A protein has these predicted regions:
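Basic helix-turn-helix/winged-helix DNA-binding cores
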Residues: 1-73
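C-terminal regulatory/oligomerization modules of transcriptional regulators
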Residues: 1-6, 80-136
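Generic secondary-structure boundary signal with a strong preference for alpha-helix termini
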Residues: 30-31, 44, 55, 77, ...
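Alpha-helix boundary/capping residues
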Residues: 59-62, 78, 95
Length: 136
């Protein structure tokens, strides 16, 4: 995602920048993941660069497998200010540990796949002895 160059952007612009549908952006707002944003004279949502940066972080948490319930909890703590720094650090540390375990698990899976691919390539490269039916 890129930073907003003007003061505010619409929900459609944020959707295009982030790849998140307007419906999902409204859902995140209703769930407290995104804070309620200001509205223009026309009643449309107006997102500021800070909102874009926060959404980018939320999407990173989501991409790394943090459940929405935990993201919501983190957003609630964030909204309470600096007095919640330690609980936020703890949440992120726990999530980082889970992520490291998942990375290790996926790395092991990738090694198994690599071994299987190597075995198949050896079989493909090895000349096959003709069978009796093929010789006839």
């Amino acid at each position: 995602m890129v930073a907003v160059t003007s003061n505010f952007i619409s929900i459609g612009e944020l959707s295009r920048l982030s790849g998140v549908s307007p419906h999902t952006l409204r859902f995140y707002e209703s769930e407290g993941i995104l804070k309620p944003v200001g509205r223009g004279a026309n009643g449309h949502r107006r997102y500021h660069n800070d909102d874009v940066l926060w959404l980018e972080f939320v999407l990173r948490l989501k991409k790394t497998g943090m459940p929405l319930a935990e993201i919501r909890q983190y957003a609630t703590l964030r909204a309470q200010g600096e007095k919640t720094l330690q609980p936020r650090v703890t949440m992120l540390e726990l999530h980082r540990e889970r992520l490291a375990a998942k990375i290790e698990e996926l790395s092991t899976c990738a090694q198994v796949l690599d071994n299987k691919i190597r075995a198949y390539r050896k079989m493909i490269a090895k000349p096959q002895a003709p069978t009796r039916k093929a010789a006839k």
